[in-house]
Amino acid sequence: MRVLVTGAAGFVGSWLVRDLVGDGHSVYAAGQAGHAFPADRGGAEWMGLDVTSAESVAEVVARAAPDAVFHLAGQASVGDSFHDPLGTWDVNATGTLRIASALPKGARLLLVSSAEAYGAVPEQEQPIAEDRPLRPCNPYAASKAAAEMAALQAGESGGIQVVVARSFNHTGPGQDPRFALASFARQLALIRAGGAEPVLRVGNLSARRDLLDVRDVVRAYVRLMDSGAPGRVYNVCSGAARSMREAVDELVEISGTRARVEVDPERVRPVDLPLLLGDNGRLRGLGWAPAIPFRQTLSDLLEWQAGRLDTRTPAAA
């Protein structure tokens, strides 16, 4: 099968490309235009893509002529979305519409959305099922909710098969240290290497999140592409919540450091959800289940960050 992956050079995309190539597909990997492609192309054909340009999207789709598209490209940071809401919307919402509109009839599209779109759901009404109304409470979440509507409408009127993966929090080796657990892992790796004082700077640790390993996420996306029903939304989540405090404590323990944990006001979001917990029953019904223990995820994340340290740089990232 000819497969196009957008956002292929990103955290999840790079893992997905690796798995799809391993499964024997002809993979066309589209990364952000103007950015360097991975040194190891992994058997995929790489292309530059600017989702804010209809011309760029049309060129990539024409070249790949895909039977299936995994659309992962997007602005993925809640924090960054507060600084640039218009740019976030153009990339995530309008960019998705550009992709969906360019696909030939009969193509299959898996849109990767976000559980942030649910907004602040009362704790007693969680875990959250897919039929929950969307009430996004940050610019990133709003852009992802709009992307879903755009893709599903294109599926109705454009003759493409659209499946939506509404993903909850995920982490693991390869994650950018702009994101919480990857940042903590990088700081601890630097502390362990003697390159920083033993202080771990964190944000809000009272928040509880449904956390899943990136490799389990990729398995879910492949399963949804193969078996997901067109027009349906599927939560991609572990079905269990843990506080960020628990995750930090376990990460510190794994690191073997005695780092002191300090809250950095700069890391606290203007708006944060106290609990985000998903119901993964619909996805499990397709035969998927999480396979990687959370402690293994944290250990792999820490070692990945440690392998990319430059101890001459500060630990603030």
Label every PLM stretch briefly.
Residues 121-126, 152-209, 214-223, 241, ...:
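NAD(P)-dependent short-chain dehydrogenase/reductase
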Residues 83-101, 108, 116-164, 169-171, ...:
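Catalytic helix-loop patch of NAD(P)-dependent Rossmann-fold dehydrogenases
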Residues 214, 233, 246, 268-296, ...:
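Conserved C-terminal active-site "lid" loop/helix of NAD(P)H-dependent oxidoreductases
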Residues 294-317:
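Amphipathic terminal alpha-helices
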Residues 6, 169-174, 198-209, 234-242, ...:
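Glycine-rich Rossmann NAD(P)(H)-binding loop
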